[in-house]
Swiss-Prot record:
Designated gene of the protein: psaJ
Major localisation: plastid
Pfam short name (any one): PSI_PsaJ
Keyword Thylakoid annotated: yes
Compartmental location: Plastid, Chloroplast thylakoid membrane
InterPro entries assigned to the protein according to its UniProt record, in alphabetical order: PSI_PsaJ, PSI_PsaJ_sf
UniProt keyword annotations, A-Z: Chloroplast, Membrane, Photosynthesis, Photosystem I, Plastid, Thylakoid, Transmembrane, Transmembrane helix
GO biological process: photosynthesis
Name this protein carries in UniProt: Photosystem I reaction center subunit IX
Similarity section: Belongs to the PsaJ family.
Transmembrane regions: 7-27
Protein backbone atom coordinates (compact mmCIF):
# COMPACT_ATOMS: atom_id res chain seq x y z
CA UNK A 1 0.00 0.00 0.00
CA UNK A 2 2.90 2.35 0.71
CA UNK A 3 4.24 1.77 -2.81
CA UNK A 4 0.88 2.71 -4.32
CA UNK A 5 0.72 5.91 -2.28
CA UNK A 6 4.28 6.75 -3.31
CA UNK A 7 3.42 6.18 -6.98
CA UNK A 8 0.25 8.30 -6.82
CA UNK A 9 2.18 11.21 -5.30
CA UNK A 10 4.69 11.44 -8.16
CA UNK A 11 4.70 14.48 -10.42
CA UNK A 12 3.45 12.90 -13.70
CA UNK A 13 0.45 11.31 -11.96
CA UNK A 14 -0.44 14.50 -10.10
CA UNK A 15 -0.01 16.57 -13.28
CA UNK A 16 -2.28 14.21 -15.23
CA UNK A 17 -4.98 14.37 -12.56
CA UNK A 18 -4.70 18.16 -12.27
CA UNK A 19 -4.88 18.81 -16.03
CA UNK A 20 -7.73 16.35 -16.40
CA UNK A 21 -9.68 18.10 -13.65
CA UNK A 22 -8.92 21.53 -15.11
CA UNK A 23 -9.99 20.43 -18.59
CA UNK A 24 -13.24 19.03 -17.19
CA UNK A 25 -14.00 22.27 -15.35
CA UNK A 26 -13.32 24.36 -18.46
CA UNK A 27 -15.47 22.06 -20.61
CA UNK A 28 -18.38 22.31 -18.18
CA UNK A 29 -18.08 26.13 -17.99
CA UNK A 30 -18.12 26.31 -21.79
CA UNK A 31 -21.12 23.96 -21.88
CA UNK A 32 -23.22 26.16 -19.59
CA UNK A 33 -21.80 29.53 -20.70
CA UNK A 34 -20.84 29.19 -24.37
CA UNK A 35 -18.81 31.89 -26.12
CA UNK A 36 -17.62 33.36 -22.82
CA UNK A 37 -14.28 34.19 -24.46
CA UNK A 38 -15.97 36.46 -27.02
CA UNK A 39 -16.94 39.92 -25.81
CA UNK A 40 -20.44 40.76 -27.08
CA UNK A 41 -20.11 44.26 -28.53
Amino acid sequence: MQDVKTYLSTAPVLATLWFGLLAGILIEINRFFPDALVLPY
